């Protein structure tokens, strides 16, 4: 079972992914939690480069895909073969929304690269944590992180369009309190997992 968390920065993805990981462990599931980019030795090196270097859009895209390819090969496929529940903090929709809708790279090209990097592995369910950009920016400011409003608006729009096009995407209103959002996540998962 592969569960992907998606959403703009400040939507609460990381918090909710960790919360679900702990919850499922307590329920007796064998669970893995990985972040993108990252999750492997190579992926963490690429993450550091992506977060600290000034990169053009193409280089950035290829590094994200390289990190993803290594994570799929080294961790996700073996975990799925062992019947683990794999939780991802970001996956393919983030790349399409950020690099495609946000930065203007060709969306179809990114989808093809995603297919190549993932070897066709797809989430059983994608939880898109949707939040108005103003609320996300306020949350980010509290963590001393800053993003461009116009850019995040484009990315959010991209995520919402992808949610209509792609299979198995559930949009969750992430503007509420942490516990309310988690209850919505459990409701969404009840169709694919005994929670």
Curated annotation (Swiss-Prot):
UniProt-annotated binding residues for ATP: 7-14
Protein name: Thymidylate kinase
EC number: 2.7.4.9
GO process terms (BP): dTDP biosynthetic process; dTTP biosynthetic process; dUDP biosynthetic process
Function according to Swiss-Prot or TrEMBL: Phosphorylation of dTMP to form dTDP in both de novo and salvage pathways of dTTP synthesis.
Record flagged with keyword Ribonucleoprotein: no
Transmembrane segments: none
InterPro entries: P-loop_NTPase, Thymidylate_kin-like_dom, Thymidylate_kin_CS, Thymidylate_kinase
Gene Ontology terms: cellular component: cytoplasm; cytosol
Superkingdom assignment: Bacteria
Organism the protein comes from: Aquifex aeolicus (strain VF5)
Catalytic reaction annotation: dTMP + ATP = dTDP + ADP
Record-stated family: Belongs to the thymidylate kinase family.
